[in-house]
Every structure is written in structure tokens, then in C-alpha cells.
A protein has these predicted regions:
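Hydrophobic alpha-helical bundle cores within soluble ligand-binding/oligomerization subdomains
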Residues: 1-185
Length: 185
């Protein structure tokens, strides 16, 4: 059983007609089953793990939604506290990575900087592809993504970077690193 429109199998269409489908940009290609996300754009429906996005936007914070997407359930109070603690302590990037930011030209797009910097994380965590480190690497990536994104933006506008601080929430820290300046802090 499928949610949304009834699917047409491209393989069945090929078998019946001998014609293959061409879908530039996969604009009409759908994954028929997903335990993570359901989207019906025509009806304005977006669900994560069965929860309507409106409910999550009103009642859950970003770290809880990230936890839901990764682990399949909203965290208990204890799980949430532990998750937030891990995201906080892993939010700093290696100091040597700061040199990489200086190598980008002043007009480099922040997304180009961000993607290059995320790729460079594997150089600092050589065991990133080992199964026993999966949870730790998930935490590191989520925790450091906000720091790298903020530093990328600061680089693109020529402002000094702001380090993360442990007393702020994930989103408050991100906004602070994006828009604060050392002279005003």
C-alpha cells in the first residue's frame, strides 16, 4: 500500500511498451516507500517518521528532530540531554581546519566552502568509515556542520569567526556564530 498517488512501475512500462523513461533532475521520480519522509507536494503534506512537519515545528527543537530522523523515534528526556551534551562538546572543529578557510578566495560562495570543509573532516577523523564509530561520526557531523556553515558565511563576508559556546543551544549557537561580531559580543 502506498501513500499519495498510485505508482507506475517504470520497469513494467518498459516491459509493456519497450520504452524507457527519461526524467531530467528526477523531478517526477518517486521513492514509493520511505520510513523517514513522506511528501505530497500537491496536498502540502510533509511528514518525518510519521510526524507532520507542522507538529515538529511547533513542539520539537532541531536536535530532537535530527535524533528522530536518525534513530526513528523522538528522544526521551534522558536521551535528549545526552544527545545535546554530545552535540555541544563536539561542536568545535580542529584548529588546523581554520587554515583551510584562509585558502578560499574572498568571493567564494559559502556553499562551496561548506562542502569542501565537510569533506575535509575525514582527514581529521581517520576512522570515520568504521562501523563502531558511526554514532560518534553522526554526532560530529551534525555538531560541526553549524560551526563550519557559520565560519563559511563569515569568510564570505570578510568578518572574523565566532567560536561556539557551551551555554547556548544548538540553534542559538548557530545564529550567534553567524551574526554576532567579536566587538559587540
Amino acid at each position: 500500500s502506498f501513500l499519495g498517488a498510485d505508482p507506475l512501475s517504470a520497469a513494467a512500462l518498459r516491459d509493456m511498451s519497450g520504452v524507457v523513461t527519461y526524467d531530467p533532475g528526477f523531478g517526477s521520480t518517486a521513492v514509493c516507500k520511505s520510513a523517514i519522509t513522506f511528501i505530497d507536494g500537491d496536498k502540502g503534506i510533509l511528514r518525518y517518521r510519521g510526524y507532520p512537519i507542522e507538529e515538529l515545528a511547533l513542539r520539537a527543537k532541531f536536535p530532537a528532530v535530527a535524533y528522530l530522523l536518525i534513530y526513528g523515534h523522538l528522544p526521551s528526556a534522558r536521551e535528549y540531554a545526552d544527545w545535546r551534551r554530545k552535540l555541544t562538546i563536539h561542536s568545535y572543529i580542529h584548529e588546523d581546519m581554520l587554515k583551510f578557510f584562509e585558502g578560499f578566495p574572498p568571493l567564494a560562495h559559502p556553499m562551496a566552502i561548506l562542502s569542501a570543509m565537510v569533506a575535509s573532516l575525514s582527514a581529521y577523523y581517520p576512522n570515520f568509515d568504521e562501523h563502531e564509530d558511526v554514532d560518534l561520526n553522526i554526532v560530529r557531523l551534525i555538531a560541526q556542520a553549524k560551526t563550519i556553515a557559520a565560519y563559511s558565511y563569515k569568510k564570505s563576508i570578510g568578518e572574523p569567526r565566532i567560536y561556539p559556546r557551551t551555554e547556548f543551544s544548538y540553534c542559538a549557537n548557530f545564529l550567534r556564530m553567524m551574526f554576532a561580531t567579536p566587538a559587540v559580543e
